[in-house]
């Protein structure tokens, strides 16, 4: 609850203003039992007193009703502005946090779960806030006014009102833990379902290609049935909880009616007061019933607060504050006895990796899958820190450098190109403002995209489908290459960037890269060994270690691992 209130810090005064207008808005309902009792007692008294009581109480009621609409408008305006702005602010805070969290954090949690937290859980928090502000405020206000008036009129009947509180508390205690447990199970199951649905959608081409539609339907059906079962358990617990509270409170109301009727029969209270006390007790019972019915919503909302808090409170963030900011980068790298193992694994994927790289050199890294090539690239970008050893950049340890300033000098082309829905121009100039047409043309030409752009209906402004689905694999890869090249980086990282290109495009890209890597430090991870003939230095990795290193010709002359890899590829061409 403290976390939830923290979300609204700075807006408490607006809530108080809204609460004030809420009180005015509901004043006709709050005072109606008293006004009705006044009319009944006046009529029973007869004469001028009856006329006066009818006119006075009716006039007061109509006067209170006349201010309902303006009070409702002001109450809703203040409440909605606070809740909606906080809802948007909470999602923005989660987006900012996700951008700060480390890459290992994102690899360990499914994107569907994060999507569920940002959309579904924040929506549940908004519902909780609305329910608490409207219903809880209404409950507190009604209870306070009814109990206060009853205490002034008759303290004996007040005993019935007061006894409702401990009975409600016992009912809540009896069900609270179970509701909380079932709510948590349902929330986790919904996150899993969200992740499975996203995974299913992304896998549709693979599923269709292997005629596995029925298998996937069955898999999703089991998941959805499990979610439905968890939801059923939650519904039953909530239903039983509400029914138990209702029965107990109705018993109390029947006793209150009998007791107030007995007191009127004995002449201790007026007949009209029976209506007042019964209406007041009905209001009190209804408020406690509403409070009990509100508990499942509050439990669900507070579980969502916990879920969102898991992200916002995570300390698995990339720390850059106070570290050295790079104003320039020459591109000299030194890897000193580098070692790394992934969390939860006993095996090192990199061990005793040593290499010195001069500015402007092109370094190629080759090896079988699992040799540690991609891990090395992730360490080089700063996605992870080495378990032991050092990476020196222009003589400075990477752990002491502000990585945001370092990455401004990098361009990375991943093995799988990542494109978003938008124009081709937007995808290439992602994150850059005011890119000239000349610079864009140069990047398109260098990445062998000029011919493609000329054929598109709107040229560079042609919209791409989701993930660039309306392009070939090679075209998507070339867009990723153009995105890297347009930044005019000091360091280029190519993670098997030409693996999706046809032979003709590969040759053209190779010529472009030879021009563009000049005076830039370049790291290339490659499977096609023919693409790294002109590399200044080739590192052959095996089981996380450097097995051999040298120029293309030197390695072939040694007839070692590299020679056998190249011979095998030559035989397959």
Question: Which sequence ranges carry the predicted segments?
Answer:
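A short amphipathic helical element positioned immediately N-terminal to and/or at the very start
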Residues: 1-12, 114
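An intracellular "coupling" helix at the cytosolic face of ABC transporter transmembrane type-1 domains
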Residues: 9, 103-104, 120-129, 133, ...
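Transmembrane helices of ABC transporter permease
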Residues: 10, 14-24, 61-64, 134-185, ...
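Transmembrane helix-loop-helix hairpins at lipid-water interfaces of multipass membrane proteins
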Residues: 15-71, 151-156, 267-271
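Juxtamembrane helix-loop junctions of ABC transporter transmembrane domains
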Residues: 20-21, 28-37, 41, 64-111, ...
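Helix-loop-helix
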Residues: 47-50, 149-163, 237-306, 311-312
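Conserved catalytic Walker-motif region of ABC-type ATPase nucleotide-binding domains
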Residues: 98, 220, 308, 335-337
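ABC-type nucleotide-binding domain
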Residues: 327-573
